[in-house]
């Protein structure tokens, strides 16, 4: 990919803060992501081996709640960093922005934590469909505070385009989570409580690293511009984050709707329903690793697209987003092929044969996770156009579709019905987001359409997906239908550049 966002393009006063180009960002992130994802995969296997389905289901519900409550409790303030850190940095007001948002996030987080401590029975019923998990709710409140802090630094460093630091924080988080999780499960209690504590501890450790880095470079942040009035700053931030907050709320509800339907609306007891969620969790272990790659790459892309957008290079934004979606979608489908081929070994040996229900729904879990990752990337265009509120339309329709189809299919097909409902809802959301971006000037090309259709084949088995992927490779190499000549040139130039860099190291 082209390197349009170099440090030299930034104001001179911002030079002490190192930024990474988009091409460098992708390479760095992918390199460190390999290690991080390997650690995460091994950790997930151990959790599935040691925890029974009901305990695994409890952890799944807690994690879903943390992902929902984190941005919800702070009104998604940190989501504005990707859009406005560059804006205030160029106006030499960045320290003001960070101070005010940090104080606001801390106050909102304290209020949320107090609510969890004061109403443990209510939250236990909400999360687990039973009022007797108050001890676990207390641990959740502590972990939530750490999650909010961790999200603050990840969003900030992403906005500063310091991908090395983001990848490092993610790696630290993964390593500490694995070490604490294994240690607590073996040395304290083989239950969901240990995993919740471990995750909170990992977020705390990563946040401390973020605090250390920011404190050492605080004086390099520009602040000699006139401070913006509180009304001006909060109006700008909240007009953007309000819709991002609603979008985040809907996206997280969208993600956990099927599991909440299983827990709250199935005819099974709370323990049996949580066990079904545990089976579902086992089918999502690897697919979620794949989709996390897409969402991380998508969040990394936002400030670069925003940079091009601010400079008026709208055509470049369209071309970059199309190419990004094609490459990411293809790699996710390759990952799905590998997962399907290795599924018997994964579920039979690594998971000790405990999750037959998870194996049965794995193909459709892979399918909807890929579509989820792709619409997460596509909505970057809405964010750049400051039309994040339009994304809520697609998410709301998708959420209602998910709930409606779950009501219809869950009683008849059980866990498979819940997964099919989620797959259909993700496809509909993807189509709606692409339609909305088209109204704002985004033009999806033929190659992107082909890649987005490939996940349908996953349910036919590994051989079918292999044939389709090989056909795509041949078409991309021999024609300009999937990759244009300019895109091939760009990829070859980037490959040649990195090849020279690698050779220079030897």
Predicted regions and their residues:
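Interfacial segments at transmembrane-helix termini and the short loops linking adjacent helices
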Residues: 22, 120-140, 274, 322, ...
